Structures are given as structure tokens and as C-alpha cells.
Regions:
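Nucleotide-activated chemistry modules centered on ATP-dependent adenylation/adenylyltransferase
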Residues: 1-74, 90-351
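Short, glycine-rich nucleotide/cofactor-binding loops
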Residues: 74-83
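Hydrophobic positions on the alpha1 helix immediately C-terminal to the Walker A/P-loop
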Residues: 86-87
Length: 351
């Protein structure tokens, strides 16, 4: 799918119509919104119905068994973005944990990401481990040159999770807190499964005869099985399942308390994603029609944590030549390796 001038989206969320995968009915509603409405009707009381105090009490009880078991109570995976920095704050100030912050640089980190991580850990008095990998640069060069349909965020997340969990294992830490919003529980989102499956098949095929990267094949054959077999005892959870996610409140808190700064430019709007995300999103839109961002924002809309208007504004953040060139040049590639020039911009929403 190319970036079109008009993209038909669900009237309730922002999932785009993609033949065979996202079906929008005559009322303009996608199958996932209809399924959500039915689920809410069928269940007498869900976790989402609990009040804020009860949810926080459940979270505190979950993490209490990990306290005072070693030098650190948990790992907080920090990217320098607003959600992960807020998670670090919650770990220390709300949950009373002693965390080890781990920042994994995939080779495309923004300067502001480093600054935000350093400021937050200094102010909160948290130990920081910086893990920088060169594998991603070499691997992504190979994958892009192949021309195969691949979802780069999935590929990257798996490698980052592996790095985080391997360090947990090394330091004997059994709890990982991540700054995932409810929408970012991407591994469980049904609308992404077919994308994962096709991407995984293609990367396995590409790595079969590669002596350097063959070691990652088991990771992409079955991620759940790989992580369970290698890191089963390690518990992963996000505070934002238990604490309301509010973009404005989070930005105010971390800006005032932790000297957090918004990157000058990042995709999407008001994010702190690595600068390869421009390429990843562009290719995902071209090859699959959408990516995890559309899914994440749609979940937040359904949970009434984000307005559809704001979600549309976020997903239509433009991608320009200069954005793509910066990431591709680091891989010794050019725009010609993904598409002939021009201005790249998300399709405008049409109902």
C-alpha cells in the first residue's frame, strides 16, 4: 500500500481499511471496534471498571514480592521517551522500588533520548546501564537490501527485549517494568498478527545462510517460546495497565520533575522514538497498510484515554525526505533503496 491522499479509516478508531485484514462496514466501523463493544457488553465487570485506588493497590501487591531480593528490585527499560521516563518515576516515587535503569541504543538514538535518561536517573538517584549494539545497523542494511516485506519495529523490539532480559538474568533481577501503554501491548493485538507472521517468515528465510545472524533465528521462529524458555522466571509488566495514561499529565510531570525535553523532531508527533522509526513506519505503510502505531492509538481511543481527533493528528505526522535520509545514510543506503524520491506524507483521513 502506498501513501495515498485519502485513507478510509474506522469512524470510531483510526484503523485504515486494508482488504482482507481490516474491514470497515457500511456504518464506517471496523471489526475490532465491534468486537470491543460486544466484549464490554458481555462482561459484567472488567478490570477497567475498577477505580484508580483499587488498580494501584493491585499493582503494589504484584511488585511487593520482588522487593529487597538483591541489589535491585527491578529493571526499568528506559528509552528516553515520555512513557518510559514516567515509568521510572512511578517505580521510585509511587511503588518505592530500587530499580536498575537499562537504556539500549539500537544505533539510531536521538541526542535528547540520552539527555532525558541521564537527567531522570541523576535526579531519581537510579543506577544506569547503557547497552549499545552494532548488530542492528548491519542487520537492517541486509534486510532493506533484500526488498522483503518486513516489520522493522517487531524485529527491533525482539532484539531490545532480548538485551534487557539477558541483563536481568545476568544481575539476578526477576521483574521488568516497561513504559508500555495499553495500546502498546503490541504482541497481543489481533490486527497485527498477520504482519508479524509474514515478517517473521521473511526474516527467518533471510537469516538461514547468514553465519553472523543465524543465532537470532530461534527468536523469530517463536518469540513467546524463546523468551519463556530462556527467561521464564522474569516477570514483565507495565504500570500503565494499572495507572491511567494521560499524555498531558505525563508531559507536565516529567518536564517539571525530571527535566525531560521533547525531541526537536521525531515520529510520530510528541514522541521520542529513534530516528529509524521514520523508515520503519514508511515501509510498514507501504508493505502492510498500517503498523503498531495505528493499533496502539486505536486501543487508547476505545479505552477513552485518547480522543480520535488527537489520534488522527498523531498518525498524520508527516515523513519527509530528510527524515528518511538521516536513518538510511547511517546504513550506507539511500532513498532509492526504498523508493524513488519525493515528499512522504501520511494519507489524510477520510470517513
Amino acid at each position: 500500500m502506498k501513501y495515498n491522499i485519502h485513507v478510509k479509516r474506522c469512524k470510531k478508531c483510526i484503523m485504515p481499511e486494508v482488504p482482507g485484514h481490516i474491514v470497515i462496514d457500511e456504518d464506517g466501523i471496523c471489526q475490532f471496534c465491534k468486537q470491543y463493544s460486544k466484549t464490554q457488553t458481555d462482561v459484567a465487570q472488567t478490570f477497567q471498571d475498577f477505580d484508580a485506588e483499587k488498580k494501584l493497590s493491585i499493582l503494589k501487591k504484584k511488585v511487593s514480592k520482588y522487593k529487597n531480593k538483591g541489589s535491585y528490585d527491578c529493571v526499568v527499560s528506559v528509552s528516553g521517551g515520555k512513557d518510559s521516563i514516567a515509568t521510572l518515576y512511578i517505580a521510585v516515587k509511587v511503588l518505592g522500588l530500587k530499580p536498575l535503569a537499562i537504556f539500549v541504543d539500537n544505533g539510531f538514538a536521538l541526542d535528547e533520548m540520552y539527555d532525558n535518561v541521564k537527567n531522570a536517573t541523576d535526579i531519581l538517584g537510579v543506577d544506569l546501564l547503557i547497552y549499545k549494539t552494532s548488530d542492528m545497523l548491519k542487520l537492517f542494511h541486509k534486510l532493506i537490501k533484500s526488498g522483503k516485506k518486513l516489520y522493522y519495529c517487531r524485529i527491533c523490539h525482539a532484539l531490545l527485549d532480548n538485551a534487557i532480559l539477558s541483563n536481568c538474568y545476568k544481575y539476578g533481577i526477576r521483574l521488568v517494568l516497561g513504559g508500555y501503554t495499553k495500546g502498546q501491548q503490541y504482541i497481543q493485538n489481533q490486527e497485527l498478527m498477520w504482519i508479524y507472521e509474514e515478517s517473521d517468515r521473511n526474516i527467518i528465510e533471510l537469516l538461514q545462510d547468514d553465519e553472523e545472524f543465524q543465532k537470532y533465528i530461534p527468536l523469530y521462529e517463536n518469540q513467546h517460546k524463546f523468551f519463556q524458555e530462556n527467561y521464564g522466571p522474569i516477570q514483565q509488566l507495565s504500570p500503565f495497565k494499572y495507572i491511567e495514561w494521560n499524555e498531558d499529565n505525563i508531559l507536565k510531570l516529567i518536564t517539571e520533575e525530571l527535566k525531560w525535553k521533547m525531541p526537536k523532531r521525531s515520529w510520530p508527533d510528541k514522541s521520542s522514538n529513534c530516528f529509524f522509526n521514520y523508515v520503519a513506519q514508511y515501509l510498514a505503510e507501504q508493505q502492510f497498510g498500517y503498523a503498531q502505531h495505528e493499533s496502539e492509538l486505536s486501543v487508547l481511543i476505545r479505552n477513552q484515554e485518547l480522543t480520535r481527533e488527537r489520534a488522527v493528528e498523531i498518525i498524520e505526522t508527516p515523513i519527509e525526505d530528510s527524515d528518511l535520509q538521516k536513518a538510511l545514510q547511517k546504513l550506507n543506503l539511500s532513498i532509492d533503496d526504498i523508493k524513488d524520491g519525493g515528499l512522504y506524507n501520511h494519507g489524510k483521513t477520510t470517513d
